[in-house]
């Protein structure tokens, strides 16, 4: 369920804004999206894992807040990010 160091490193390299960036909204949203995808797959198999479901809902809420922040701050970066991640249609 958790992301490995290698998976995190690849996501950070893909979405970072500069060499030392690991905390920009884009990186945070991309990491949360990957964790949400993995946890969603886990919950398809383990339907009664309510504790993980609560964690999933918290992650979705955190991602939603970060997306809203990015949308208000820089709409072009927001549009590019949701297109790259395949969020919203």
Curated annotation (Swiss-Prot):
What PROSITE patterns would the database entry show?
RIBOSOMAL_S15
What are the BP-aspect GO terms?
translation
CC terms in the record's Gene Ontology section: cytosolic small ribosomal subunit
- Entry superkingdom: Bacteria
Q: A Gene Ontology MF term for this entry?
A: rRNA binding
Tell me the keywords, alphabetical order.
Ribonucleoprotein, Ribosomal protein, RNA-binding, rRNA-binding
Q: Which CDD domains match?
A: Ribosomal_S15p_S13e (cd00353)
UniProt xrefs under InterPro entries: Ribosomal_uS15 (IPR000589), Ribosomal_uS15_bac-type (IPR005290), uS15_NS1_RNA-bd_sf (IPR009068)
Q: Name one Pfam family in it.
A: Ribosomal_S15
Annotated family:
Belongs to the universal ribosomal protein uS15 family.
Q: What does this protein do?
A: One of the primary rRNA binding proteins, it binds directly to 16S rRNA where it helps nucleate assembly of the platform of the 30S subunit by binding and bridging several RNA helices of the 16S rRNA.
Q: What does the record note on quaternary structure?
A: Part of the 30S ribosomal subunit. Forms a bridge to the 50S subunit in the 70S ribosome, contacting the 23S rRNA.
- Protein name listed in UniProt: Small ribosomal subunit protein uS15
Q: What is the lineage of its organism?
A: Bacteria, Pseudomonadati, Dictyoglomota, Dictyoglomia, Dictyoglomales
In the UniProt record, what gene is named as encoding this protein? rpsO
């Amino acid at each position: 369920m958790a992301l490995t160091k290698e998976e995190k490193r690849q996501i950070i390299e893909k979405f970072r804004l500069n060499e030392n960036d690991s905390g920009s909204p884009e990186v945070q949203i991309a990491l949360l999206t990957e964790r949400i995808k993995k946890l969603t797959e886990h919950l398809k198999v383990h339907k009664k894992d309510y504790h993980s479901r609560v964690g999933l809902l918290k992650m979705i809420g955190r991602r939603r807040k970060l997306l809203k922040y990015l949308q208000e701050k820089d709409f072009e970066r927001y549009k590019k990010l949701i297109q790259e991640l395949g969020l919203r249609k």
